[in-house]
């Protein structure tokens, strides 16, 4: 939701995905405020746009998903160039991995994510080059990745180690 502005402002994507998954305006507002994604007024405008399908273009871009995740984690809410939020998220993940090498078993994390979120297989670097999204059920899974953003947001609110690294 948000047209061209959403490609530069990942917070719009995060708000849209959270609201789309929660289907409850009050609950979404609470989470958006706790995550400090945007002002209450901006969140209300985004939700009204979603309800009325104004500037509501569905995207199958993994980059937009990463922009939303970057905003939810507090890494980058807006970008000055294409891919900035996604790159910041990648750098933060690499820094986290270096800092917590013994604490994170990435293979187990990816295996679990593949079970819960079909899109995770596309995100995994080892498979991203060979994974094609061309079947209706695959496209549906991509469009339903708001569940992934919601899960990440809930983990951050629950106090999971999602410290700002970028």
Please place each PLM-identified region on the residue numbering:
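A contiguous, well-structured pocket-lining segment that forms one wall/lid of small-molecule binding clefts
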Residues: 16-166
């Amino acid at each position: 939701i948000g047209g061209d502005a959403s490609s530069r402002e990942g917070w719009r994507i995060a708000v849209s995905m959270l609201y789309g998954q929660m289907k409850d305006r009050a609950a979404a507002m609470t989470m958006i405020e706790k995550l400090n994604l945007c002002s209450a007024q901006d969140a209300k405008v985004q939700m009204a746009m979603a309800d009325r399908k104004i500037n509501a273009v569905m995207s199958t871009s993994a980059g937009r998903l990463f922009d939303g995740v970057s905003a939810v984690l507090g890494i980058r809410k807006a970008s000055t160039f294409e891919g900035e939020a996604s790159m910041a998220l990648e750098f933060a993940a690499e820094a986290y991995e270096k800092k917590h090498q013994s604490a994170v078993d990435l293979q187990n994390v990816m295996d679990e994510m593949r079970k819960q979120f079909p899109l995770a297989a596309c995100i995994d670097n080892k498979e991203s080059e060979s994974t094609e999204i061309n079947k209706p059920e695959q496209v549906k899974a991509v469009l339903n990745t708001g569940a992934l953003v919601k899960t990440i947001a809930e983990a951050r609110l629950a106090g999971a180690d999602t410290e700002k690294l970028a």
